[in-house]
Amino acid sequence: MDTLVEKASADLKSTFTISNEMSEKIFVIPPNRTRYLSEIAENNRVYDKKGLEQFEVAQKLYGIYKTICSVMNVSSNEVEKSLIGKLGLNEDEILQQAQNDKGIAIPKEGGTTDEESQRSLLHLLIKEFDRVKLNLDPYNWEIITTWDEKVKKYKNPIYSFKVRDKDINIETHSESLSHLQIPKIALPKYQAWGDLLKWCLQENVPGEFPYTSGLYPFKRTGEDPARMFAGEGGPERTNKRFHYVSAGLPAKRLSTAFDSVTLYGNDPDLRPDIYGKIGNAGVSICCLDDAKKLYSGFDLAHVMTSVSMTINGPAPMLLGFFMNAAIDQQCEIYIKENNLEAEVEAKIAEIYKGKERPKYNGDLPESNNGLGLMLLGVTGDQVLPADVYAEIKTNTIAQVRGTVQADILKEDQAQNTCIFSTEFALRLMGDVQEYFIDNNVRNFYSVSISGYHIAEAGANPITQLALTLSNGFTYVEYYLSRGMDINKFGPNLSFFFSNGIDPEYAVIGRVARKIWAKAMKHKYGANARAQMLKYHIQTSGRSLHAQEIDFNDIRTTLQALYAIYDNCNSLHTNAYDEAITTPTEESVRRAMAIQLIINKELGLNKNENPIQGSFIIEELTDLVEEAVLLEFDRITERGGVLGAMETMYQRSKIQEESLYYETLKHNGDFPIIGVNTFLSSQGSPTVLPAEVIRATEEEKKFQIKTLKNLHNANDTQSLLKELQHKAVNNENIFEALMEVCKVCSLGQITNALFEVGGQYRRNM
């Protein structure tokens, strides 16, 4: 370079300086951490190898122990149990028992018996036991010695345990119509210590590491795992559907589908490429008032209410709308409890002097009490004292339960609703999680790491699980690189899987829990809460067919059975007509009935670990787990998840597997009833829907009008500039979004962030 400057007589020295807001290279995952997936695979294999070694040691110890019992001619279980203690064999007890038992005799070489030879043999056996026990982990010895206590706890009528310092008492049995006591948890009847230890290390009871059979000792009573997906038209129509699907259920578990306009961060508009999509295949939400109307009539801070939002690119903005809607609901409750309605109404009238106030479009559904609609067009901080509002806000965000999907990695790999550059999207995710930690948001999941879309795009169950878990561990590494505490962000992570009918789907949840728990505990040193992988299951939409659509309910039932037997944390059962149209109220009711019948009527489901102990389930678990770990190694070879994405490895793999399935389906090698075999006399033609449900013109125009009134009512430019300033200066963007979302529309916020974060461009 110096020679070039000299010969050209030109000043080529750069005067560019890097400021605090810039970086030469953005590393989402530090370069020295790109092998994290192979490290996890090795960690889990080491755990399994050590478990097998400990199994061998425990079996030897059991053999020596039973030999001692045989030499002493012990026949009583109580006496046998008295021979072992917390530290090992009770040597004094053994010798005392030998001294007291006159019938015990050990032959000598000459055919005579002698007490000395007996004591000598016992000493040798005790010595050998102690020598072998040196190779047994003390934790594993505790598992062996406390097994009988564990069995007793499950045989007692009531099992007591704690969840977040709250005492829970659960009945351990249910009575059948034949008056048999059916155990909720069935335990193995192993006697040998090695068998017991191996089972505890690899399976264990629900609620204990490695959580293979479930995260909690027992399922919750009074709250079924049902979470039904809904979204169509404007917020009012979807609000009516929410009240319909949750009618009569003690727990209100709402799952929200958004239209493509919202998914891409746009506002409703007359533009031809937007207008036709408003409110179709999802609900149209563009501002805080829309969120208030969408969830009106549901107390969002109630312990029995939970909301899931399937949104990714603009997830932080929709989360801001939701949080502010929940806060304003609690402000409304405060206003009513303190008889402040007239005072608040006067303040709102003053704010909207000469302007049209927002309103709920149409009549409220019967079960909607109007909660959340009092403060349409304003927020609680405009009508309540600052200290009162601050306290309500703090309490509310700590109480709300739910999930926002916000999984940007799977969007690049399978779904395609990316709007910001990958690095900026990940930064937004990190800012949300940081805000959750700083503000004690413990009951809301900041991300739902999703395999469903990967499976729907064509991936087989092993690829779905491997890519989903690899994405999850990528978020763990990224959050750790930002200095977050794994024990604080770990519990805010959740997962979302599809359930088909393939054999691997029978174990997808248990394998996910095992891999996650072992890695989080032994690789990352996380606590028990962070080790628990919580996941939602939706039955496979791809498995539903447009021919013989009545058969789809049979497929969905079998998939739901897989999910419930595998102890999923929540479940959505698809409607049989989803293959041809947006589900009707009738088809949604049938879909809901599928899981209710399994949960309420199916006798075997009274037991909560029905697949444990099955040879094929154990074999499948081992096969799928190793296949996932091998995929981790393949991703590592390509530079980790982000490196593999640069060469479109994940997308290519999904497409190849999709093509393989479609080929087998079309040539008939993969039989599908009513599609390529067992055809009706008419040849099982495609069923056409009686009507295709779409958003009405009135709904579309009302959404555009709502947006126009919002823009006319608020001065937003200063807030948007402040948001951009925080983004450029590496401050927490979501903290600013919580304020911006009160007055700005989704499209305004998206466009403002495009200017500082960059738009998404796919690698070519």
What are these regions (language model features)?
Residues 1, 271-274, 300-303, 411, ...:
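Short acidic (Asp/Glu) and glycine-rich catalytic loops that position anionic groups and cofactors
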Residues 442, 483-489, 526-539, 547-579, ...:
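Flexible glycine/proline-rich, aromatic-decorated loop/lid segments
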Residues 569, 601, 605, 627-719, ...:
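Intrinsic disorder at enzyme termini
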Residues 575-581, 601-623, 635, 708-711, ...:
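N-terminal glycine-/lysine-enriched basic segments
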Residues 413-418, 454-460, 496-504, 538-549, ...:
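Short beta-alpha connecting loops at secondary-structure transitions
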Residues 3-94, 98-108, 112-193:
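Extended helical scaffolds that flank P-loop GTPase cores
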Residues 148, 152-499, 504-505, 523, ...:
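Catalytic alpha/beta active-site cores
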Residues 3, 120, 124, 249, ...:
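Generic recognition of stable, solvent-exposed alpha-helical segments in well-folded globular domains
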